[in-house]
């Protein structure tokens, strides 16, 4: 039975199966497609073929939404239209969306000393014996921040990790069901795996059947403010520069790219692997990092002319990097 209700449901189901087979269907995809489905059913209940009017009315920016929100809301429908065009199932044209406001944020460039001081501070958090919340904080901070640093995971992905998705035998984390992002797998470094195993054993003594890997004293997952606040407090205790927990993800990408500059490599293969491991929907999103690595374009030109032109074109920033 179809989950869609409009007369376009057969086409939507067809599109959904295609995206699932391509590993490009997430929970957020479901919500966005259902929104367009309801739009079609409410305003065009008798239409069993896609029309320009149906699409244009959906793409119109709403008074209550930002330009970026409008672009995100319409992105999947754009892909749906392109999918139908390629199969000659529609003549509808993808409407031009409002230009996205570019993010001018420059991630913090961590120094070795800053990171060393930060992780040392994490390892030496003190707690009172009768304060379970402080004890859990002292156990969690060294592990979750090292996890972000060593894997490039999004902060929301780390906070949303369920125990069932963390394979501590093989050292593989499954990122599934995270709103708006592709499902993917992350392989842990041996040292990170050992930390995760030790942490899990300690947490099992407190909450034997917990659902989430990282939980508070109430046995519920931490919220984003807990991660943000604790990173800031610990960071500010040993460093004077400004940085955020999400900068650890940026650092992961940039460090990988910098390491490649001293190797013989195929840029396309490397960036494809990095893109997949970071859960980017498209390679275009991974290319963002090339714009913030100093002098990378000249290094690339010297090492590989073949893929230089592929990297250099303007980056499509439809996918959020945050």
Set out the residue ranges of the language-model regions.
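Conserved catalytic core of the tyrosine transesterase superfamily
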Residues: 1-322
């Amino acid at each position: 039975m179809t989950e869609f209700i409009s007369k376009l449901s057969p086409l939507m189901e067809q599109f959904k199966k295609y995206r699932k087979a391509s590993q490009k269907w997430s929970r957020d995809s479901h919500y966005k497609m259902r929104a367009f489905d309801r739009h079609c059913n409410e305003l065009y209940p008798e239409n069993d073929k896609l029309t320009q009017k149906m699409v244009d009315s959906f793409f119109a920016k709403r008074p209550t939404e930002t330009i970026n929100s409008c672009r995100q809301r319409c992105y999947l429908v754009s892909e749906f239209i392109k999918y139908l065009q390629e199969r000659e199932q529609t003549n509808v044209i993808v409407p031009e969306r409002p230009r996205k406001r570019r993010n001018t944020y420059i991630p913090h460039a961590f120094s070795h000393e800053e990171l060393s001081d930060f992780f040392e501070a994490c390892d030496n958090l003190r707690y009172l014996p009768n304060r379970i919340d402080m004890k859990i904080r002292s156990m969690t901070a060294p592990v979750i921040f090292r996890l972000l640093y060593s894997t490039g995971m999004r902060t929301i992905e780390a906070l949303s990790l369920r125990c069932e998705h963390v394979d501590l035998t093989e050292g593989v984390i499954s990122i599934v069901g995270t709103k708006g992002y592709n499902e993917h797998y992350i392989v842990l470094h041996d040292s990170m795996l050992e930390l995760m195993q030790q942490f899990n054993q300690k947490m099992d003594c407190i909450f034997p059947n917990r659902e989430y890997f990282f939980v508070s004293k109430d046995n519920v997952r931490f919220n984003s403010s807990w991660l943000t606040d604790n990173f800031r407090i610990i960071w500010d205790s040993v460093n004077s520069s400004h940085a955020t927990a999400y900068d650890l993800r940026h650092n992961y990408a940039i460090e990988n790219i910098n390491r490649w500059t001293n190797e013989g490599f195929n840029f396309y293969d490397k960036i494809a692997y990095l893109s997949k491991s970071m859960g980017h929907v498209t390679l275009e999103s991974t290319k963002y990092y090339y714009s913030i690595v100093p002098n990378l374009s000249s290094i690339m030109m010297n090492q590989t002319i073949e893929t230089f032109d592929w990297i250099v074109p303007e980056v499509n920033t439809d996918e959020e990097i945050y």
